[in-house]
Amino acid sequence: EANQFSTTTKLKGYAAFVFGANTFGGNLRTTPNVSAYSGGVFGPDGQYIGGGAAPGSKYASYASQTAGALSFPYDLRLDLDTSFTGKDLLRTRLRAGNFNGSAWFGNAPVGLLGMETAFESGAGNNVVEINRLFYQFPIGSGFTATFGPRVRQDDMLAMWPSAYPADTVLDIFTYAGAPGTYSLNLGAGGGLWWKAGGFSLSANYVSANGDSSNPSEGGIGTEGAAQTGTVQLAYGGANYGLAAAYTYSSGAGLYGGNGTPLAVAGFGGNSTNSVGLSAYFSPLSASWFPSISAGWGLNTYVGGSTTAGATSYTTATSGYADTINLGGDSSQSWYLGFQWGDFLLKGNTVGFAFGQPTFVTSSGFNDGNYAWEGWYKMQVTDNISVTPAIYYLSAPLGALQKDSGQSFNSFGGLIKTTFRF
């Protein structure tokens, strides 16, 4: 105890180094004779408008030029966990990273390359920020309350309905198959859960812009709040769990690492009703039988105004602009994840997952796409692991490429070194 950081506070650390690169292929070309158009991404002819790629150019070449280099970013997290009674928790997380310039941050040219560990403060690279600040405490028998100015949706769930992955690679496989429902919204919020036996019921609210007093830009329960309200009913045991959840989102939805550009636009411009069904089973001890996790999500966009940036997805071609209202449309997602513990050597884990990132399933768009990843986590010491991984995206732009019959894909590989202390 003489060497403790504090009599009430424990320090936990996480650092991840990611070294790797991505390649791109396919015959997709940007729409000819159209200058860069920031408000939209595809024309009425279905061809992609590159938003920076030269008109008529091959998009795979543009992607390689802007996101094809070897890169070596990092993510650092320091958790200060304080307990005053032995049953409560005040968590303060300090976080820094420099992923914004990498292909793994969830930005163009391929948002679905986003990684779970890809972080950078809005203030810039290598800047330390307060990423979490919340207080959690029991109330009576079976109830737990959580509130704070920097709390995430999953911090307030009694159970997370997935055992996959033992080590994260692509972000899309870390949302229990339903990123619309489990959006991991982060901001000001509060929640309550109840547990009895194997059953649990959780309810929470998060406003991503809850620090603002301007109702048009933020606040609690306002138009600008970028808010989510979630209810989850779950049942689980020592090695299994299943859950059904509902989330209402208003101005807070997907980012590029969660779905196709069209699906992401639907969330950005509409209020959304989302449901998710997720389950997992893990053997009590390592065996030939894998841990299996599965999940499915369905989202319905609630229609509204057709003003640009509100409910519409903008398209354009030379001398012409149009809007597509996604109000009333729907999108879906699903995944299956498998992993085997103590594979080849004790402490090592191998796993893979596949599925469809969020894609629009109505309005006649051919927005479907597939993602796959495989990895092998080598536990070098109790505190250090090294994970080589590869991954593939079949049609990361969805309808933007498929409606014109053109192809575009991405393949990548990396080595992730993780330190826990």
Predicted segments, located by residue:
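Short, flexible helix-coil linker/hinge segments at the edges of structured domains or between repeats
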Residues: W160-T174
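A short secondary-structure junction signal
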Residues: G25, L157-W160, N204, S213-E217
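Beta-barrel outer-membrane channel/assembly domains of diderm bacteria
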Residues: E1-A145, F173-G177, T181-F199, A203-N204, ...
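Surface-exposed extracellular loop regions of Gram-negative outer-membrane beta-barrel proteins
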Residues: N100-A103, R150-Y164, V350-T358
